[in-house]
Amino acid sequence: MQHSFYQEDELLNNEISNRGFLLTKIDDIIGWARAHSLWPMTFGLACCAVEMMQAASSRYDMDRFGMLFRPSPRQSDLMIVAGTLTNKMAPALRKVYDQMAVPKWVLSMGSCANGGGYYHFSYSVVRGCDRIVPVDVYVPGCPPTAEALIYGLMQLQKKIKRTTGFKYDARQIH
């Protein structure tokens, strides 16, 4: 029987309330804490950023996932790239990514960020932000709905929970 994302949290809460304590591996606790305390930094470049703002509004309530939008890359661990990435903007994207705290994740939002979108054949457009930074989750759509973004964030939370240990690339640590 497979459990959904929220059923796992419910089972965890039941175990703590029944026993008063929890037996687990440190990797599971760290993964759970990281997944439920994402601090995203927005990199809104086009119309997808409007949908991202809508997802952060009270109707969708992204705060329930433990997310707190941060204005600085040094305070964030998730970058949401939303919109058309141009060749002139690509070095800035990489610079901001390099300034983020480790561990860090990237969510690519919309057709333009995923693969160039409508402007794919333009000389000035990067054909996907994954050519500049490593991307963990792709959210399709033009523009993607707020529900699609929230689903992508839930997929990222599942991925973070599966990550174990403190294995970091030496190039990521400053």
Curated annotation (Swiss-Prot):
Gene name of this polypeptide: nuoB
Binding site for [4Fe-4S] cluster: 47-48, 112, 142
Organism: Rickettsia akari (strain Hartford)
Primary localisation category: membrane
Subcellular location: Cell inner membrane
Documented EC number(s): 7.1.1.-
Translocase recorded as keyword: yes
Record keywords: 4Fe-4S, Cell inner membrane, Cell membrane, Iron, Iron-sulfur, Membrane, Metal-binding, NAD, Quinone, Translocase, Transport, Ubiquinone
Quaternary structure (record): NDH-1 is composed of 14 different subunits. Subunits NuoB, C, D, E, F, and G constitute the peripheral sector of the complex.
A single BP term in Gene Ontology: electron transport coupled proton transport
Alphabetized NCBIfam families for the sequence: nuoB_fam, PRK06411.1
A GO term for molecular function: 4 iron, 4 sulfur cluster binding
Family: Belongs to the complex I 20 kDa subunit family.
UniProt protein name: NADH-quinone oxidoreductase subunit B
Cofactor: [4Fe-4S] cluster
Its job: NDH-1 shuttles electrons from NADH, via FMN and iron-sulfur (Fe-S) centers, to quinones in the respiratory chain. Couples the redox reaction to proton translocation (for every two electrons transferred, four hydrogen ions are translocated across the cytoplasmic membrane), and thus conserves the redox energy in a proton gradient.
Cofactor annotation comment: Binds 1 [4Fe-4S] cluster.
Reaction equations catalysed: a quinone + NADH + 5 H(+)(in) = a quinol + NAD(+) + 4 H(+)(out)
Enzyme class, first EC level, given as a word: translocase
PROSITE patterns on file: COMPLEX1_20K
Membrane topology: Peripheral membrane protein
GO CC annotation terms, alphabetical: plasma membrane; respiratory chain complex I
